[in-house]
């Protein structure tokens, strides 16, 4: 008796792109054509009470099509790539069971990589270790911890700025918990499982043919956030005793700069300029991640008909008319 043939993997369309590239418009355009549910691939949208600075889809937009992995945790808590992977694989199955089509949409490329390529064997976050490192940074400054990292993990330290508190803390935490440099663990083969083997993830990438145009959009959007009450949003968060600027939520682009302004460390214009610059740097990193995906389908996000082009690409993916 011959073995039963393996079922072909189910194609999952993934709409990826940097900040301000038009992902929401393209996703909603697809929702007008097909019964989809959107799974957010965004590490900032997971937080409740952080709406303006994360450019969260509006209530009307979220009412028009089901969205997932938005407003799922408190800003005092953390959410990992491993949690995203587990939640997304579960949601894909649940959405399909309802007879609907999942669409992954967002710009957190680390999440997408964890989903499609598996996880590294890095230790999880340890609150006690982080508290110790925070106390040392408060006393000695992050550049001193960066110098310590350079002694135990020179490869990781070389690619981090001396004040990149989030990444310096994580790299030292990994070394303290595992006894191995994070660069060594990241270079090891990824831990895979069969959970994602049933799916073929196809990325449609919104990328700018002229980055200056996207940079202008980013500045306009940051100004619109300020006009919409972003500083008031951060002030409400800042009043909470359990929130501080070193939490992952408050390290989100824009929030850190607004917190510094409210602390009196910068003036309004400097805060605005730093927020726009940080967003552009994020955009640059996102595009670098995208360009490392040879399998992606590229749509020019600054073309006048970019939404229609993205919609056409997504429909071709879902109809199976793209190369396997």
Curated annotation (Swiss-Prot):
Monomer. One of its GO terms (biological process) is tRNA modification. One of its GO terms (molecular function) is ATP binding. It is an enzyme of class 2 (transferase). The record marks 108, 130 as: Interaction with substrate tRNA. Residues 42-45, 166-170, 251-256, 284-291 are annotated as: Interaction with substrate tRNA. The gene is miaA. Catalyzes the transfer of a dimethylallyl group onto the adenine at position 37 in tRNAs that read codons beginning with uridine, leading to the formation of N6-(dimethylallyl)adenosine (i(6)A). This is tRNA dimethylallyltransferase. NCBIfam families: miaA. The keyword S-adenosyl-L-methionine does not apply. ATP binds at residues 17-24. SUPFAM superfamilies: P-loop containing nucleoside triphosphate hydrolases. It holds the Pfam family IPPT. Belongs to the IPP transferase family. Its cofactor is Mg(2+). It comes from Burkholderia lata (strain ATCC 17760 / DSM 23089 / LMG 22485 / NCIMB 9086 / R18194 / 383). Its EC number is 2.5.1.75. InterPro entries: Dimethylallyltransferase, IPT, P-loop_NTPase. Keywords: ATP-binding, Magnesium, Nucleotide-binding, Transferase, tRNA processing. The keyword tRNA processing applies. Substrate binds at residues 19-24. It catalyses: adenosine(37) in tRNA + dimethylallyl diphosphate = N(6)-dimethylallyladenosine(37) in tRNA + diphosphate.
